[in-house]
From Swiss-Prot:
Protein's recorded name: Hyperosmolality-gated Ca2+ permeable channel 1.6
Residue segments, region Disordered: 718-761
Keywords per UniProt: Calcium, Ion channel, Ion transport, Membrane, Transmembrane, Transmembrane helix, Transport
Subcellular location: Membrane
Transmembrane segments: 7-27, 101-121, 156-176, 375-395, 419-439, 467-487, 512-532, 583-603, 630-650, 653-673
A cellular component term, taken from the record's GO annotations: membrane
Molecular function (Gene Ontology), one example: calcium-activated cation channel activity
Domain of life of the organism encoding this protein: Eukaryota
Assigned protein family: Belongs to the CSC1 (TC 1.A.17) family.
Topology of the protein relative to the lipid bilayer: Multi-pass membrane protein
Biased amino acid composition, Basic and acidic residues: 718-731
Organism listed in the record: Arabidopsis thaliana
Amino acid sequence: MATINDIGVAAAINIVTAFAFLLAFAIFRIQPVNDRVYFPKWYLKGLRSSSIQTGGFGSKFINLDFRSYIRFLNWMPEALKMPEPELVDHAGLDSVVYLRIYLLGLKIFFPIACVAFTTMVPVNWTNKGLDRLRHSNISFSDIDKLSLSNIPNGSPRFWVHLCMAYAITFWTCFILKREYQNIALMRLQFLANDQRRPNQFTVLVRNIPADPHESICELVEHFFKVNHPDHYLTFQAVHDATKLSELVLTRKQMQNLLDYNINKHMRNLSNRPVIKMGFLGCCGEEADGIKYYTSVVEGLTREISEEKQRLRTGTKSIVPAAFVSFKSRWGAAVCAQTQQTRNPTEWLTEWAAEPRDIYYDNLALPYVDLKIRRLIVGVAYFFLTFFFMIPIAFVQSLANIEGIEKAFPFLKPLIEVKLLKSIIQGFLPGIALKIFLLFLPRILMQMSKFEGFVSTSSLERRAATRFYMFQFINVFLGSIVTGTAFQQLNSFLNQSANDIPKTIGVSIPMKATFFITYIMVDGWAGVAGEILRLKPLIIYHLKNSFLVRTEKDREEATDPGTIGFNTGEPQIQLYFLLGLVYAAVSPILLPFILVFFGLAFVVYRHQVINVYNQKYESAGKFWPDVHRRVVTALVVSQLLLMGLLSTKHASKSTPLLLVLPLLTIGFHKHCKNRYQPAFVTYPLQQEAMIKDTLDRIREPNLNLKAFLRDAYAHPEFRVGEDPEPEEKLESDMSPPDLVATKRWSWRNTPLPSKDSCREIP
């Protein structure tokens, strides 16, 4: 197991690595050639222009102002300078709420760390429990004397740990409640102050039943004119536009090549650009590049127009789902929050996500398929979690060399070199675990897409939930179980089964050393590596050197990325779990967690301001998940402490811990009932009706139908289209007295019903 020297070596490696990353970033960011990599958000907002096109040859690529190198650390205060309301306007509420997770960690753990180091550390260190176990084949190091393992069985000092558990619980619940309340208020204010957006008036309707007499479009029109006659406005059918998407992508590529050849010709008017028609443009007949790509683009444009017309006029491409818009937010809220028919599996309604958040590929999935898909994903996830225990066991074998040496003495000469041993135990386990987890988020995101979620935000929240469960089962519990097995392997082999729980109770607190190494690799060096953006930097310069032909290519060469809720939030929750579990067991871990939260807050605030470009805005809808996982970590810490004290024969203090999980669960239910509705439902009176009234006063002649007409059309339908002329408002606000329908009578008569007509207007 890792000793103090091993932890010191690991800390030195990670501190040097993090400092090198931060120093490299501070220098790279001020170079004009890297401007698009480190400030892409300002380019997207149109507030920054490329410096490569201006200035002398040297100043295009290298910053020649030596005074800027003196101020190279100014990015830290600049990242903290922007006030929160301005940050909401600049980056959105999702980004601000995400940053508040790091602040939540600082608010919870800083006071806990202060109390733990003034009370828990002296109580643990001044005992001799581990010294008395030297004869029992239990492996430990001096750093483990700071943990609960150093207290002998039945000691009255366990009352201090009991009091600490109560203090941690009450303080954490207090901070969680206050933060939940503040963020719920921020969300409601954001929605109240938000400008008019299509998703405020629109509901997604799924699982529309088939009808032998009417098409999907006619059925939707008929259903909502009948059931919501005073509020229904219009609808947007959902098409399977796979072929259209492929055509649009191909035309975009060909248009880019055409622009490149035109620019090439403009630089040298005497020569027309020539291309070869053979394999990869390396052989074959020669042709005029401009004429060739012009004809290709024109042909693809005709194909796209024909495909759009086919999708609009045909019915086979329409899927049983639609975006239904209403004349008011109140009408949309009523529809989204009520059951439409007796059959709860038909005409399913929910608030539509904003247009850029919609994941169109999953809208066509039938309701029955969703159940089957989720069952398949559940089984696949179980086996993925189960088989991942193998690399976890391998990582733990690296972290417990002493235990392996005792069980397998022939390996001792290979790993006894002092520096090598410190690196293996203090640094290698953390980096190995980080590597094994590298591709997991992509796998979990593909699982979420297969499950059928219809918005990017719901996909990320689902993937985050699975990633958190995976981290809890494999990284936390798996590391403890397999690590304890390797660490105390010799002890297990030479003691009776009745003594194994006692050995586990002693060794679990000692696993803090492994998690310390992981926190330093992932939370220190990893966060510093995030701000350096080494991968996007390399990709940008490779594209800029070999693939960029036009200014549009240069704009697309850098992906600004997003906050990555599906990967970042579960990682943060692992630190909450480790901090709450080990606060009363082995407080030595807390300073490492505090460094992570502090560094990550500064780094990600800088990234949110200058780099990340969110793909959607959910107004902090993910916060209930954050709250629930912190509460889960708190309950796990209480149960684990209860189990540890029971193995230490603290019979008088242990029963008093039984009340803590009950109080915590009751607290969670209170917060769920009090604050979660703000993240799930839309208040009809205070929010919907007030905003509708203000709209009618401020813009009495608003043409809402024109505003919503193509808001939820498939993105490829909106490419290269001219806006249609606006219609009069009066036509939108006066529904017909009779609802047109093509449904035939069911009473054995060939005549249509009296309200039927040949075509719905």
